[in-house]
């Protein structure tokens, strides 16, 4: 069956959450938003494209930083309202220069930084 981004369930703002996961290690790297056009561009080019809610513009991951995300596989959840992007990550995924945006853990009621910025 051919894929049509319009078959996905978008929120009231026309967006769908997308979780980026390293295809080789399974590490969750980040979560961002996509609209139908960002999904289509990602599938078409193989370069992950998100929708920036703050800038109201497309955001090709790594276009300016060089920290590119290459799409290996796109998975759709059972309700078609969330995407899992299995990717190959070049450099850090987070704008804080960390491998993952999920670098703060709650341990024994305290927030702990568990990942240092990459050099």
UniProtKB/Swiss-Prot annotation:
So what does this thing catalyse? 1-(5-phospho-beta-D-ribosyl)-5'-AMP + H2O = 1-(5-phospho-beta-D-ribosyl)-5-[(5-phospho-beta-D-ribosylamino)methylideneamino]imidazole-4-carboxamide
* EC number, as in UniProt: 3.5.4.19
**Which InterPro entries does the entry mention?**
PRA-CH, PRib_AMP_CycHydrolase_dom, PRib_AMP_CycHydrolase_sf
Q: Which residues bind Mg(2+)?
A: 77, 79, 81
Q: Which Gene3D superfamilies match?
A: Phosphoribosyl-AMP cyclohydrolase (3.10.20.810)
Known cofactor(s): Mg(2+); Zn(2+)
Which pathway is it part of?
Answer: Amino-acid biosynthesis; L-histidine biosynthesis; L-histidine from 5-phospho-alpha-D-ribose 1-diphosphate: step 3/9
State the free-text cofactor note: Binds 1 Mg(2+) ion per subunit. Binds 1 zinc ion per subunit.
GO MF annotation: an example: magnesium ion binding
Keyword terms, alphabetized: Amino-acid biosynthesis, Cytoplasm, Histidine biosynthesis, Hydrolase, Magnesium, Metal-binding, Zinc
Binding sites annotated in the UniProt record for Zn(2+): 78, 94, 101
Q: Which top EC class applies here?
A: hydrolase
SUPFAM superfamilies registered for this protein in UniProt = HisI-like
Q: Which GO terms describe its biological process?
A: L-histidine biosynthetic process
Please give an example of a GO cellular component term from this record. Answer: cytoplasm
Q: Does the keyword Iron apply?
A: no
- Organism superkingdom: Bacteria
**Compartments, record wording:** Cytoplasm
Function, as annotated, reads:
Catalyzes the hydrolysis of the adenine ring of phosphoribosyl-AMP.
Family from the record: Belongs to the PRA-CH family.
Q: How does it assemble?
A: Homodimer.
Q: What is this protein called?
A: Phosphoribosyl-AMP cyclohydrolase
Q: Which organism is it from?
A: Cereibacter sphaeroides (strain ATCC 17023 / DSM 158 / JCM 6121 / CCUG 31486 / LMG 2827 / NBRC 12203 / NCIMB 8253 / ATH 2.4.1.)
């Amino acid at each position: 069956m051919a894929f049509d981004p319009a078959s996905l369930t978008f929120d009231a703002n026309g967006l769908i959450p997308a979780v980026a996961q390293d295809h080789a290690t399974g590490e969750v790297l980040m979560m961002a938003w996509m609209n139908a056009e960002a999904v289509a561009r990602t599938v078409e080019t193989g370069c992950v494209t998100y929708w920036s809610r703050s800038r109201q513009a497309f955001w090709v991951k790594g276009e300016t930083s060089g920290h590119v995300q290459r799409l290996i596989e796109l998975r759709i959840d059972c309700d078609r309202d969330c995407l899992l992007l299995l990717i190959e990550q070049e450099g850090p995924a987070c704008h804080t220069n960390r491998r993952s945006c999920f670098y703060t853990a709650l341990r024994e009621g305290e927030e702990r930084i568990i990942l240092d910025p990459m050099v």
